[in-house]
A protein has these predicted regions:
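Noncatalytic, solvent-exposed loop/strand surfaces
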Residues: 18-370
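Bacterial N-terminal signal peptides
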Residues: 4-17
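Intrinsically disordered, low-complexity proline-rich regions
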Residues: 1-2, 270
């Protein structure tokens, strides 16, 4: 939420005559920026969408999420990073809960940067400073909590010196829910780079590696025959087996300040990830027994992504590259289909755009609000 107003997004979608659907986490039900199958956008709007309700929103970069007729917002309120549950029908506030003190730097507004999640009767959120909380959906009461810094040895110093990744600009990447696990890029020490918690109790299920956290959220997918969590950490791409955190593969990517923001995109046995400095990589993941190997099938600096996570539609990948250019490339071989100037945006080195796939169309919202 970048501006001062939060609108009922679920009802805005309804004004486009889309079937009702939950959007319970960052980038939607499948965490890939795609609306559920069967939803379509009209060729054009016959009338201006009607604003059903609006409420003031505090600073932050978190997205609201929707489930079961409820909207969960995460913004700065009264000097705290705060969760608020709203009624989707009328915007009425049902409860609010302070999560952590806010964080500010030169890269964005003072407020949370990671998107919360709704899962059944629980909600989950992580603050910029690494305070991870699980609360009851019904009343917002705290169920369990943990601190990336205090409990797991992660570093958080803010915008100081040359410290890279989430330790510098905050924990932006929302953890991923899978089965009974909540898996997070904690960035801790003593093997707590990636940590899987029991989502109901917060108890440790496994921890793995010593990677520092960057900004990209983890995703879960079956790649080369093994179900795994794929993280884009300050050290590069990383694959770990979901049940036990067993190491599978690694692809080193080192950049200044570890500005690794875009979420990994999965296409069969390919993992696509990249940054503004290293470029975009299409990694081929192969299997050798219980281990795997990652090798670049293709790479491109011509369409290096920065803050915006790309989306896949069929055999093509769409994203925002350098100089604010929208691009389309073939995911199989990395061949660029086209690139062109996109929506009105800010400075090229800080521009971002949110891309959502609805049927055969892409919705795009730029940092200029267009």
């Amino acid at each position: 939420m970048k501006g001062p107003i939060l609108m009922a997004l679920g009802l805005a979608w309804a004004s486009l005559q889309l079937p009702a659907a939950d959007w319970p986490q960052w980038r939607g039900p499948n965490r890939d920026g795609a609306a559920p199958a069967g939803q379509k956008l009209p060729a054009q709007l016959t009338e201006e969408p009607r604003v059903v309700w609006r409420i003031p929103a505090g600073p932050g970069l978190s997205s609201p999420v929707i489930a079961g007729g409820k909207v969960l917002a995460f913004d700065a309120q009264a000097g705290q990073e705060t969760l608020r549950l709203l009624d989707a029908a009328d915007g009425r506030e049902l409860w609010r809960a302070a999560v952590d003190q806010p964080f500010s730097d030169s890269q964005g507004p003072t407020g949370p940067r990671g998107t919360p999640m709704i899962d059944g009767d629980r909600v989950y959120a992580v603050s910029c400073r690494g305070e991870l909380q699980c609360r009851a959906l019904a009343d917002g009461k705290l169920v369990w909590r943990t601190s990336y810094v205090t409990n797991w040895g992660a570093t958080f110093v803010g915008e100081k010196g040359a410290i890279p990744g989430a330790a510098r600009h905050g924990n932006n990447g929302a953890p991923v829910l899978h089965g009974d696990l909540l898996i997070a890029n904690v960035g801790g020490t003593n093997g707590a780079g990636v940590v899987a918690f029991d989502k109901r109790t917060g108890e440790l299920r496994w921890k793995s590696q010593n990677d520092q956290a960057a900004y990209a959220p983890p995703v879960v997918a079956t790649v080369a025959g093994i179900e795994q969590v794929i993280s884009f950490t300050a050290d590069g791409g990383l694959g770990l087996a979901v049940p036990d955190g067993r190491f599978l593969w690694r692809f080193p990517i080192k950049t200044a300040f570890a500005r690794h923001v875009g979420a990994p995109v999965i296409f069969g046995d390919r993992v696509i990830l990249g940054s503004h400095q290293a470029g975009l990589f299409g990694l081929a993941i192969t299997r050798d027994g219980d281990r795997q190997e990652a090798q670049p099938a293709w790479s491109s600096k011509e369409v290096a992504i920065n803050f915006a996570s790309p989306v896949r539609v069929g055999q093509q990948l769409y994203g925002l590259g350098p100089a604010k250019d929208l691009f389309c490339l073939d995911v199989a071989d990395g061949k660029i289909r086209w690139k062109q100037p996109g929506l009105p945006m800010g400075a090229p080195d800080k521009a971002w755009v949110s891309l959502l796939v609805v049927g055969d169309k892409i919705l795009a919202l730029s940092d200029a609000g267009v």
